[in-house]
Curated annotation (Swiss-Prot):
PANTHER family from the UniProt entry: PROTEIN PHOSPHATASE
Protein name stated in the entry: Probable protein phosphatase 2C 38
Catalytic activity: O-phospho-L-seryl-[protein] + H2O = L-seryl-[protein] + phosphate; O-phospho-L-threonyl-[protein] + H2O = L-threonyl-[protein] + phosphate
GO process annotations (BP): regulation of intracellular signal transduction
UniProt binding sites for Mn(2+) 2: 154, 377, 423
Binding residues annotated for Mn(2+) 1, in chain numbering: 154-155
Keyword Hydrolase: yes
Record has DNA repair as a keyword: no
Naturally occurring in which organism (per UniProt): Oryza sativa subsp. japonica (Rice)
Length: 460
């Protein structure tokens, strides 16, 4: 039990004319990533953990006699336009909140509950509102029969559901834009290290994002891995720029995570942004399943991430009722409270240490590797890596594996946190079948790297 007192975190100040703080609240149980965090009677929306308090910033600025910037506080009619009306279907709402367009396969793409020959995917809405999770499986990616793109995206903020779906639909297209196309001018890698000249955030190459090349972990294919890593960095950069200048999606206080996997032959290329996660299910010498985490949860608790944020004047502290959840805040205002150190969107924090540069890694598939599970934090907050691998290994069929994980996570939420709201869950299970192992090691990475050299790198 954690007692919530009437004290304030370091740096917390009232706006001029603000009412006195409410008395101390009763002790509440600790819970992971609550969507709304209450402090001293005031509600600060935790982006990445929940909605953001635009009204609070408006009150602070008006009390100080400062005009509200249009780029930070868009007019009401613009915000309404960013959330299009959707007609409810009779007979109840779908748990996955997927539209007919999501359910219709397009060029090997599946973006709703279902399964393909190589993967299964499933999402279920929690009880916090609209489902902000999105997912995608794209077979024959880049027109290659043995190549698959998978991704899960966890939106947050008032328009997180729009941001996550935008990234789901556009990011793989940006990634494939420079594969297998002639006549495109090579884009310099400076695109991911240059500053955005029109405000709203700066992208810089950081030491913690540099992955050592030519090691056993990377499969001893430094040249091929470097080419693919550069391509992935470009795609993430251009995707974030698309969100920044999008005319109908307000991403100032909204954003999304992204964890993606490209599989070809023996090769897996993983790109991660935020706190969604990819876990490998493999077998040990006794043929027993165990879990290998392929990504790192990029949260403000990581020393290198925290150092970057503080260097750029961002603040990091936890709310009293969530002492284990570090959040990122603006230098002078206690908002938005982002529970991750990297994300698409969230442009209010892009000048203060938040970046959209993914952590990129490579894994060579072995004969012991069976599947990869990509999931949002609605799953990982209540199930361990080992539990998820065990659940998938015991599923009745590969087609039902993702649904089995989501339903298990929902039950775990009700059992472990009965007073908390259930988070949205999205899962993609990618099965590493024997057909993918017939190619010699490294052949997939080499094929994709050759395609990059032929196609150039124009992603804009």
């Amino acid at each position: 039990m954690v007692a919530v007192t009437g004290g304030r975190p370091p740096g917390l100040q009232d706006a001029p004319g603000a009412p006195p703080p409410a008395p101390a609240a009763e002790a509440v149980p600790s819970r992971p990533l609550a969507r709304d965090a209450t402090y001293g009677g005031r509600v600060y929306g935790g982006v990445g953990g929940g909605g953001c308090c635009l009204e609070f910033l408006d009150c602070v600025l008006r009390a100080m006699g400062v005009a509200t910037p249009a780029e930070i506080m868009p007019p009401a009619d613009f915000r309404w336009a960013a959330r299009p009306m959707r007609r409810r279907r009779r007979g109840g709402s779908s748990s996955s909140s997927s539209s007919p367009r999501d359910r219709e396969p397009r060029d090997g793409r599946i973006a709703a509950n279902g399964a393909s020959a190589a993967a299964s995917l499933y999402t279920m809405r929690g009880n916090k509102g609209v489902n902000q999770d999105a997912m995608l499986v794209w077979e024959n990616f880049c027109s290659k029969e043995d190549t698959i793109f998978c991704g899960v995206f966890d939106g947050h903020g008032p328009y997180g559901h729009l941001v996550s779906k935008r990234v789901r639909d556009l990011l793989p297209i940006k990634l494939s834009a420079n594969l297998g196309r002639d006549g495109h001018k090579e884009t310099s890698t400076n695109i991911v290290t240059s500053s955005m000249t029109e405000g709203g955030g700066t992208e810089r190459m950081d030491r913690d994002t540099e992955t050592p090349l030519g090691t056993e972990e990377n499969g001893d294919y430094p040249e091929m891995f470097a080419a693919l890593r550069t391509s992935l960095l470009r795609a993430f950069y251009v995707m974030d720029r698309d969100l920044k200048f999008h005319k109908t999606i307000d991403s100032v206080f909204s954003g999304t995570t992204a964890v993606t996997v490209i599989k070809q032959g023996h090769d897996l290329l993983i790109g991660n942004l935020g706190d969604s996660r990819a876990v490998l299910g493999t077998r040990d010498e006794y043929d027993q399943f165990f879990a290998v985490q392929l990504t790192v949860d990029l949260k403000p608790t990581i020393p290198s991430e925290a150092a970057r944020i503080r260097e750029r004047s961002g603040r990091i502290f936890s709310l009293p009722d969530e002492p284990d959840v570090a959040r990122v805040w603006l230098p002078k205002y206690n908002m938005p409270g982002l529970a991750m150190a990297r994300a698409f969107g969230d442009f209010c924090l892009k000048d203060y240490g938040l970046i959209s540069m993914p952590d990129v890694s490579y894994h060579r598939i072995t004969e012991k590797d069976e599947f990869v599970v990509l999931a949002t934090d609605g799953v990982w907050d209540v199930l361990s890596n080992s539990e998820v691998v065990s659940i998938v290994s015991q599923a009745k069929s590969e087609a039902s594996a993702a649904r089995f994980v989501v339903e298990s996570a929902q039950r775990a939420w009700r059992t472990r946190f009965p007073t908390s709201k259930i988070d949205d869950c999205a899962v993609v299970c990618l099965f590493l079948n024997t057909d993918a192992r017939n190619k010699p090691p490294g052949s997939g990475i080499k094929d994709l790297a050759n395609a990059i050299e032929l196609g150039g790198g124009n992603l804009s």
